[in-house]
Amino acid sequence: MPRLKFTLAYVGTAYHGWQTQRRKSLPELPTIQSTLEKVIASIIGKPVRVCGAGRTDAGVHAEGQVAHVDIPESKLKLDWQLVLNASLPKNIRVVHSLYVEDTFHAQHDAVQKLYAYRLWLNHRYTPPVLYPFVWSCGRLDLEAMDKASTFLLGTHNFVSLQNRGTKLLSTVRTISALYREPSQFFSLNESHEVTWFFKADGFLKQMVRNIMGLLVLVGRRKIQPEKIPYILEAKDRRHSAPTAPAHGLTLKKVFYS
């Protein structure tokens, strides 16, 4: 069957992550994957399997999630972006869609992913419009966080920054970019919002949120930047920091060769 590749944006607040979660004798939890599968199945008249590039956690957002699904020949002429956006909840949007070779795989063919984590630095208030999308941290030592981030660049065993729950052959990953950019969303003179960007060939379970939690501890001067290599070398999650909240994280883009 023809394979449809599509790019998704969604607000993850109301969803229990990407992956379908079925529970015995209990209602199915709402997820991005299950919502997409139900809508597409209603259009083509039979069950489908949607595969996503990244299994975002509950509450995590996306601007550039990529997925694929196999479509019957009889539905080839549909404008899938329009059809899906007409049926999906308003907090899930199809940004782009196209047909690809049936060998394409949204998850297995991905070579890098880019995530963004938004921090709000004004300790006095958080704008209500931003509250669902930022972690309100108050003032932070951004220069110390910059220094700490340099120790995380490159290829490392990131098991100290992985939460339990996934069995993997390797916990070695390569971070090619880790940097921050200011945002002047509400002020022309002073920025209260900082976005951290994380680009790597792959991420372990909640790895981005764990790195963000660690960098915030550095920013609060509770950990020295120079301690980062020792945390990595310990290969023990207990030596790291608490996991940052899910709602500050957004999957920005998935890269393919």
UniProtKB/Swiss-Prot annotation:
Alphabetical list of CDD domains matching this protein: PseudoU_synth_EcTruA
The keyword Glycoprotein is assigned to this record: no
Name of the protein: tRNA pseudouridine synthase A
GO biological process assignments: tRNA pseudouridine synthesis
Binding site for substrate: Y115
Catalysis performed (reactions): uridine(38/39/40) in tRNA = pseudouridine(38/39/40) in tRNA
EC id: 5.4.99.12
Any one GO molecular-function label of the UniProt entry: tRNA pseudouridine(38-40) synthase activity
Function: Formation of pseudouridine at positions 38, 39 and 40 in the anticodon stem and loop of transfer RNAs.
Pfam families assigned to the protein according to its UniProt record, in alphabetical order: PseudoU_synth_1
Subunit description: Homodimer.
Signal peptide positions (record): none
Gene: truA
Disulfide-bonded cysteines: none
